[in-house]
């Protein structure tokens, strides 16, 4: 999605702030320095070196929650989900109040298809950091797949307060309302979006608003002369949000056709790519 959440600054800078905060609690300086160096190395693309430095920090202090958290962040960025999960679990074992570990474990749980656990982690993150609630669009998506549609609706309404021109947020709000109250109600309560510059988002918005068509979405996605990566991304989003629309409208055939194209033929290496993959897996489970 276009929507972003923590960290909002470069990872190495964010990590430096994190380790300084822990240093104030009396953590060993040597471990802090190792983790800061690891963050700088990772930001420079020296990933193996960053992992080695994090390993050294863990060896120096095996029960240091932040060391596992930092290494888990590295593994998550490297798309090594199981290793990231293991480190976030250990971080929370040693410090159950480490809010960001719940947030990142929630994202990894979702990627693994552990929907209920993902929603629970995001809930716990908000318990510990309630001020972050408007930013947490990932929680809204987890709530949708967990069947907690009213909670999801409220989450996307919160996000609208800080991100008013994101069609995806409006679409997920639509989906939550449609599941709980029907499509007619969801159109009446569709969140207002005036200008999402990403192609073909405004055509997707028109479809959900009841004044557009699937043909217009696909035509917009392939218009002009986008680069191959941009064309793939446009086509992914077109198929994915068409599939979600047909799914909630009860058109199983068209839903499967578009979702499978998004997840299998035009896949993208991003969180939304993972959402499409999870949705495709759920559809395949339903057919067995």
What does each model-found stretch correspond to?
Residues 43-44, 77-78, 111-112, 145, ...:
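Register position in tetratricopeptide repeats
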